[in-house]
């Protein structure tokens, strides 16, 4: 399998970004729903488990920039037999996914009042950063006023919009695979190559 994209398929790097991001995104959801369903999220016992959610979210968020750069410098596989409207919709849907992959980790980090511990180092909570200090000084907004709307965005998007966007992405991939039989799904599967 080539490491760069071709007009026929995604390369190994694009597939690695896709499946690593998907796995981290799904795992972050599994972890946070474990906390919601089986733990008291205000308990100190929940903090190490929530930290796993935060680390996974950071993996998703920090991988978006190199993923976008890789997408911009590589050719994208051709859209098979798509109308202008379908091609536009596919393009808009992919950029919508990128917005989601940025928005969820960003609002999650900003709205968390605890450090994210990666083991070898810890990322301070947003409240302790120079950026928030500047926001607080510049606009005179306290953490107590700043954090709740950001946290609300994270929860609304996470509990509703993200599920819809991901479900539409999976449904579109399955539509291409089952109905169209055009190879759109298989060209993103790991280990597959048209060559």
At which residue positions do the language-model features occur?
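Membrane-embedded alpha-helical bundles that constitute the cytochrome b-like, heme-associated redox core
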Residues: 1-195
């Amino acid at each position: 399998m080539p490491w760069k994209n071709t007009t026929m398929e995604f390369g190994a790097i694009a597939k690695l970004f896709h499946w690593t991001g998907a796995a981290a995104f799904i795992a972050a959801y599994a972890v946070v729903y474990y906390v919601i369903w089986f733990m008291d999220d205000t308990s100190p016992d929940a903090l190490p488990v929530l930290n796993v959610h935060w680390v996974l979210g950071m993996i998703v968020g920090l991988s978006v920039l190199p993923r976008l750069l890789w997408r911009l410098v590589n050719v994208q596989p051709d859209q098979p037999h798509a109308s202008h409207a379908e091609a536009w919709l596919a393009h808009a849907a992919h950029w919508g996914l990128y917005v989601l992959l940025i928005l969820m980790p960003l609002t999650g980090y900003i709205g968390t009042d605890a450090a994210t511990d990666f083991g070898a180092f810890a990322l301070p909570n947003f409240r302790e950063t120079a950026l928030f200090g500047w926001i607080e000084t510049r606009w005179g907004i306290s953490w107590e006023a700043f954090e709740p709307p950001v946290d609300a965005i994270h929860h609304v998007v996470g509990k509703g919009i993200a599920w819809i966007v991901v479900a539409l992405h999976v449904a579109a991939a399955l539509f291409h695979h089952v109905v169209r039989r055009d190879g759109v799904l298989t060209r993103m599967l790991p280990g597959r190559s048209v060559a």
